[in-house]
């Protein structure tokens, strides 16, 4: 169950990371509320997952999901670069996430 909670926390990290772009420095109300809500829930779920998962593993996976998810969202929806080097780098992060999951107790 902790792994599912961690996955949801990571996906919410993507929401708030991308949401930051639309807050315009927290000057736009609706995007700011959505972003802050996603931040709070993401952190709460991360904390909950860390009750049974190793801290280093959980945090690294959470940030990895957020980083890869935000980058893919940027590529697919925001017209950001999808260069081979960038895609390879994202693949390496995914490989690291998988390795951490497989090596966890």
Swiss-Prot record:
Periplasmic face residues: 50-57, 103-105
Protein origin, superkingdom: Bacteria
Disulfide-bonded cysteines: none
Subcellular location(s) of the protein: Cell inner membrane
Entry GO terms, CC: plasma membrane
NCBIfam families in alphabetical order: PRK11431.1
Protein name: Guanidinium exporter
Organism: Salmonella typhimurium (strain LT2 / SGSC1412 / ATCC 700720)
Gene name as annotated: gdx
